[in-house]
């Protein structure tokens, strides 16, 4: 016979961004708890609102499965003394298992007998296991936590109720000074406290109190209501996935409505209006069927449709205040002079240990000069890049960005166009922030891409130079994101810029305000981001490519893909093993590896030396790999007919030199001795 278990934790309002991850975590930890306690079940469903986290297990076994375990003890010769009596070693072993020497049996393993005992544990009833769910709740982790009411413990928010039901059976468990009961709280304004009748009646019991416990149902309600408004007014409403997820975690009983604002505000840049609505007010944007922004918005109320007109007026009033600010800053910022703002950046701190934003811009400008040549920019592009690098942070001192910091770069583009700068300069100022997330949009223009790389590289090197290096999950200056951005941009544009050579060049630059250090740490940090970009590539292949001598990002990623592609083919294992053997022996070469043909003693070493001399890796990675694998028979013949570590030192070093030259060329693809062929 199966049962159904419900666990609900009632809390103060949770931050919206915490709700969904916490709900997921609760479900995963409940499943692990049941598995650990040998309780089978059919399904787990989780629930969440801003004021509760809950999980329901259906088809739950009414008792644990029985457990039978075998334990291996000491060898028989240790377990028995000369008289055949059990020794203290044997007695201590069985006592530790809660058994006696009468339970001992001997089993033979590889010709020797050992003590074995079998322990059987009869499964307990599910009722005896249910109290353990409190430990599941205690084990939940959160990005922030708090103390309350003078308590020593802490949690994401103060706890108000705990409901644990096994079908209709109530468990009065204790959790953080809260006594469990079947009482749950309804909607803060529309509902009241209610008793949950059973695990299966949970959603309906709360629905009567204006709480939609299932987030999927709440989400569908919001979407359906928005679609209804769309159809009624003939408009298009942008349902942003992130905004939708945030809004559904702000309400327990959603009601969507449309408000409006004066069309005069449409003269302000669209990005300002959208930011005001989406980021600050959590409103959905409304457009006409051609995509043109309309003076309307969609909001979602935490409640029903009663007195909705008053709610609409209140939301419109709040939004207008925001739009007034935007209109004011748009008008006033156009009176500012870009060069004046750039000069004032001398007084804005980039970081107290590093210097001002203006100094950061100057260093970035010097880096762009180096990158422009390596990226093959045209004369016009180089001119635009120099101008963009000279002014690209100016908009940080505008009123608009001061009020709406999400618009940095975006407003810089608009203000530079108004000031008569070229579209390329304006676009680069917007694009230099890209990507803003791990999978974020990349710059489209070469000028913007180079400026983005330069800005990020100076940021990375500057923070490393003063010892502000990310450790563990701690990365307060988002240096991992910046490095990932550099790697992604280089890959996307296919620029053959070797990162090790680039970093060497940057360290050679002499900046008055800062001297770069920690070069090795920077290189390891960049390699870690390339490793991440390789995704699910096997670890040994990643290590082989990262250990190679070619540090062009696009080449490294292509090499890893090529190795994965051929790893299942028949010639992969023998070819890699041949190259791997060459790599291992080449490490023994001393000094500069030069080959003297006069020291050859057989045709096989001559053949390998000639093959290595003519080897020029070219074309796509798959072609280069074929070139290397084609050497496998020549390498094998060399090893079969040649004693590499010959007694004659000159002959030995000559043979090692052949292998050293081979591996030097092969290492431009990967260090093959890092690949596991077993």
From Swiss-Prot:
Its main location: cytoplasm. GO terms for molecular function: arginine-tRNA ligase activity; ATP binding; glycine-tRNA ligase activity. It comes from the Bacteria. It is found in: Cytoplasm. It catalyses: tRNA(Gly) + glycine + ATP = glycyl-tRNA(Gly) + AMP + diphosphate. One of its GO terms (cellular component) is cytosol. PROSITE patterns: AA_TRNA_LIGASE_II_GLYAB. Its EC number is 6.1.1.14. The keyword Aminoacyl-tRNA synthetase applies. Keywords: Aminoacyl-tRNA synthetase, ATP-binding, Cytoplasm, Ligase, Nucleotide-binding, Protein biosynthesis. One of its GO terms (biological process) is arginyl-tRNA aminoacylation. It is an enzyme of class 6 (ligase). It holds the Pfam family tRNA_synt_2f. Belongs to the class-II aminoacyl-tRNA synthetase family. Tetramer of two alpha and two beta subunits. PANTHER family: GLYCINE--TRNA LIGASE, CHLOROPLASTIC_MITOCHONDRIAL 2, GLYCYL-TRNA SYNTHETASE. This is Glycine--tRNA ligase beta subunit. It comes from Streptococcus pneumoniae (strain Taiwan19F-14).
């Amino acid at each position: 016979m199966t049962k159904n278990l419900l666990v609900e934790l009632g809390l103060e309002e949770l931050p919206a961004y915490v709700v969904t991850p916490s709900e997921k975590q609760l479900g995963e930890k409940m499943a692990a708890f049941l598995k650990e306690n040998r309780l089978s079940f059919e399904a787990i469903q989780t629930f969440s609102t801003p004021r509760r986290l809950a999980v329901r297990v259906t088809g739950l076994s009414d008792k644990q499965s029985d457990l039978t375990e075998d334990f291996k003890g000491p060898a028989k010769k240790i377990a028995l003394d000369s008289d055949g009596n059990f020794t203290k070693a044997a007695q201590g072993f069985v006592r530790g298992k809660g058994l006696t020497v009468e339970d001992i049996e001997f089993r033979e393993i590889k010709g020797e007998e050992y003590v074995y005992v079998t322990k059987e544990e009869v499964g307990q009833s599910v009722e005896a296991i249910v109290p353990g769910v409190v430990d599941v709740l205690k084990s939940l982790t959160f990005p922030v936590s708090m103390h309350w009411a003078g308590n020593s413990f802490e949690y994401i928010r103060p706890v108000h109720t705990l409901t644990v039901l096994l079908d209709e059976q109530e468990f009065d468990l204790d959790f953080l000074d809260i006594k469990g009961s079947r009482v749950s709280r309804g909607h803060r304004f529309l509902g009241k406290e209610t008793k949950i009748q059973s695990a299966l009646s949970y959603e309906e019991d709360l629905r009567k109190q204006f709480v939609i416990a299932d987030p999927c149902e709440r989400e569908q309600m919001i979407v359906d209501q928005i679609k209804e408004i769309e159809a009624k007014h003939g408009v298009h409403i942008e349902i942003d996935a992130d905004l939708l997820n945030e809004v559904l975690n702000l309400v327990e009983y959603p009601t969507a409505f449309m408000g409006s604002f004066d069309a005069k505000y449409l003269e302000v840049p669209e990005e300002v209006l959208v930011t005001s609505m989406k980021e600050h007010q959590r409103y959905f944007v409304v457009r006409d069927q051609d995509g043109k922004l309309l003076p309307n918005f969609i909001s979602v109320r935490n409640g029903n449709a009663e007195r909705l007109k008053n709610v609409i007026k209140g939301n419109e009033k709040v939004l207008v205040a925001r739009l007034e600010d935007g209109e004011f800053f748009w008008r006033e910022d156009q009176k500012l002079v870009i060069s004046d703002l750039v000069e004032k950046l001398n007084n804005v701190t980039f970081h107290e240990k590093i210097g001002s934003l203006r100094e950061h811009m100057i260093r970035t400008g010097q880096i762009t000069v180096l990158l422009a040549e390596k990226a093959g920019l045209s004369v016009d592009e180089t001119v635009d890049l120099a101008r963009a690098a000279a002014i690209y942070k100016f908009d940080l001192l505008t009123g608009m960005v001061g009020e709406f910091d999400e618009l940095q770069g975006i407003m810089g583009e608009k203000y530079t166009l108004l000031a008569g700068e070229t579209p390329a300069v304006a676009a680069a100022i917007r694009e230099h922030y890209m990507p803003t997330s791990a999978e974020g949009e990349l710059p489209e223009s070469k000028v913007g891409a180079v400026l983005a790389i330069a800005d990020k590289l100076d940021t990375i090197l500057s923070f490393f130079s003063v010892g502000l290096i990310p450790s563990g999950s701690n990365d307060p200056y988002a240096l991992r994101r910046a490095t990932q951005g550099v790697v992604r941009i280089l890959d996307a544009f296919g620029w053959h810029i070797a990162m090790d050579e680039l970093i060497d060049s940057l360290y050679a630059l002499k900046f008055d305000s800062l001297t770069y250090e920690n070069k090795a740490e920077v290189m390891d940090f960049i390699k870690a981001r390339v490793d991440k970009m390789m995704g699910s590539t096997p670890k040994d292949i990643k290590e082989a490519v990262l250990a190679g001598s070619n540090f062009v990002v696009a080449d490294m990623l292509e090499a890893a893909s090529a190795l994965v592609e051929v790893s299942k083919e028949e010639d992969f294992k023998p070819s890699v093993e041949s190259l791997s053997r060459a790599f291992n022996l080449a490490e023994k070469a001393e000094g500069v590896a030069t080959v003297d043909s006069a020291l050859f003693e057989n045709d096989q070493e001559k053949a390998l030396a000639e093959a290595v001399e003519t080897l020029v890796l070219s074309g796509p990675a798959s072609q280069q790999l074929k070139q290397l694998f084609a050497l496998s028979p020549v390498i094998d013949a060399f090893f079969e007919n040649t004693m590499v570590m010959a007694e004659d030192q000159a002959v030995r070093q000559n043979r090692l030199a052949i292998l050293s030259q081979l591996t030097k060329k092969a290492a431009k693809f990967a260090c093959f001795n890092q690949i596991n062929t077993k």
